[in-house]
Amino acid sequence: MQQYSSKYNKQAILLVNLGTPDNYDTKSIKRYLKEFLSDPRVIEANPILWKIILNLIILPIRAKKNIHTYKTVWNKQHNKSPLLFYTENLADKLDKKLDNYIVDYAMRYGNPSIESKIKSLQDQGATEIIIFPLYPQYSATTATVYDEVYRVLSKLRWQPTIKGINPYYDNKFHIQTISQQIKEHLKKLDSTPDTVLFSFHGLPKEYFDKGDPYYCHCYKTYRLVKEELQNEYPNIDFELSFQSRFGPKKWLEPYTTVKLEEFAKQNKSVVIIAPGFSADCLETLEELAISEKENFIKKGGKEFSLIPCLNDSNQHVDMLYNIIDEEICLKK
């Protein structure tokens, strides 16, 4: 990130993504998963019982299991996970576009931490920090970003002003960007697919029952993009699903795996997009692009094509710029 004189640059924008291990070894993965899965916003369970299950069962098994999956998607050229690589580049591009603001990024879990970046921004003279969670749909992962921000602030004698960017699941710039992304992908294909499947990260159904708006936000994103596209593509079915189920509880349905198996049995061709993810990560590059694709083809599916996340594309930079400008009226 660029360094700025504290005399002239007092406002900062902090992009926050979910997080990633520092490397794909057992120790790094276990450390990351422990921080992530210890957050009561993420796992709502008896804290004592969950701590025992997490440390004795979940972490030893999942850390070893995930070595191969992380290694498969790891950006070995830069020795970074794709999520970290794209988020870092995204922040750098937005920083260059916003001359009057300091732009940086942090991860809610893992490194670079929110705490380290708030300190860095203060050292550069930021007296106002705009927090921008890169999750279009609001859920526990959004709330916990602010939990951590205010935990950090509670320890500071000098606290910067904090502002937050709202979830952008139905923002016109977001809907237009996702719609255009799908159009551009469809133009590259040799034939028109039978279905475009919108796959969002899943959530235990009980969270929805308790009032979490995530499902409603996902559905609205899906509906608004569908409305943008269905007149132009009347022969394509647009459908919604949820992936990455974890544990024995019932999660939001329909499950992506189940929907893809249904399409495979019907020998359909499918294009899949994961608009809840701002950058490609394990859930898109391994779970969807490899595991789900292999299962889909094995079960009789015709063609499978995954649309990349917005990542560090210029379209993503422009979209974030417009959303921020709409929310806070950027200084030009």
Curated annotation (Swiss-Prot):
Annotated pathway: Porphyrin-containing compound metabolism; protoheme biosynthesis; protoheme from protoporphyrin-IX: step 1/1
InterPro entries listed in its UniProt record: Ferrochelatase (IPR001015), Ferrochelatase_AS (IPR019772), Ferrochelatase_C (IPR033644), Ferrochelatase_N (IPR033659)
Described purpose of this protein according to its UniProt entry: Catalyzes the ferrous insertion into protoporphyrin IX.
Family: Belongs to the ferrochelatase family.
GO MF terms held by the record: ferrochelatase activity; metal ion binding
Keyword annotations from UniProtKB, A to Z: Cytoplasm, Heme biosynthesis, Iron, Lyase, Metal-binding, Porphyrin biosynthesis
Keyword Lyase on entry: yes
SUPFAM superfamilies reported for this sequence: Chelatase
Annotated gene: hemH
Biological processes, Gene Ontology terms: heme biosynthetic process
Protein name: Ferrochelatase
Locations listed in the record: Cytoplasm
Entry EC no(s): 4.98.1.1
Catalytic activity: heme b + 2 H(+) = protoporphyrin IX + Fe(2+)
Cytoplasm is among the record's keywords: yes
Pfam family, one: Ferrochelatase
Binding residues for Fe cation: H201, E283
HAMAP family listed in its UniProt record: Ferrochelatase
Alphabetized NCBIfam families for the sequence: hemH
GO cellular component: cytoplasm
Tree of life domain: Bacteria
